[in-house]
């Protein structure tokens, strides 16, 4: 199984936040861990890194929430009869990830890994709307991150 990652960086103005953005190799490592865990074959995903303005605009348009968020997922739905290994798109807000990592006393790279895994699971149909769904999804995140040598991101929440 291989993840094919199309990375986009979309920043306006003079923001210098790309320094924290994971490398394509890191993104592929994290995505491949998710694919392996879920038993999926080759999949393609676009990961777009944005500023807060774009994140807030998309979050408002698609979720009715008028603030930037860490990650948004847009699953690809192929027309009936069309087979394509395209999971969809992730939109990751770099300033939110950096801020959350600092607030939660986490390594920025670990938080990027967590939000990438989280977003990919959303693309695969997992959600956390109710407690049972959240428990299942968080369990998968914890397992996948552990395989990557990353501590349980929810430990601070418990």
Curated annotation (Swiss-Prot):
Keywords for the protein's UniProt record, in alphabetical order: Cytoplasm, Endonuclease, Hydrolase, Metal-binding, Nuclease, Ribosome biogenesis, rRNA processing, Zinc
S-S pairs: none
Residues the record lists as binding Zn(2+): 118, 122, 128
Gene Ontology cellular component list: cytoplasm
Keyword flag Hydrolase: yes
UniProt-listed InterPro entries: MetalPrtase_cat_dom_sf_prd (IPR023091), YbeY (IPR002036), YbeY_CS (IPR020549)
Top EC class of this enzyme: hydrolase
Principal location: cytoplasm
GO biological-process terms attached to the record: rRNA processing
Compartments reported by the entry: Cytoplasm
EC number: 3.1.-.-
Gene Ontology molecular function: metalloendopeptidase activity; RNA endonuclease activity; zinc ion binding
Family of the protein in this entry: Belongs to the endoribonuclease YbeY family.
Protein name (database record): Endoribonuclease YbeY
């Amino acid at each position: 199984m291989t993840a094919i990652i199309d990375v986009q960086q979309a920043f306006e103005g003079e923001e210098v936040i790309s320094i924290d953005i994971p490398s394509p190799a890191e993104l592929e490592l994290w995505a491949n861990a998710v694919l392996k865990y879920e038993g999926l074959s080759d999949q393609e995903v676009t990961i777009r890194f944005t500023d807060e303005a774009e994140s807030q605009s998309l979050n408002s348009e698609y979720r009715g929430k008028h603030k930037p968020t860490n990650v948004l997922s847009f699953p690809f739905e192929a027309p009936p009869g069309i087979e394509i290994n395209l999971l969809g798109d992730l939109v990751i807000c770099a300033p939110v990830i950096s801020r959350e990592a600092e607030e939660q006393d986490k390594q920025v790279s670990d938080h990027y890994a967590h939000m990438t895994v989280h977003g990919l699971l959303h693309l695969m149909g997992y959600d956390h709307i109710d407690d049972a769904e959240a428990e299942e999804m968080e369990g998968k995140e914890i397992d996948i991150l552990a395989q990557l040598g990353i501590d349980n991101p929810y430990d601070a929440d418990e």
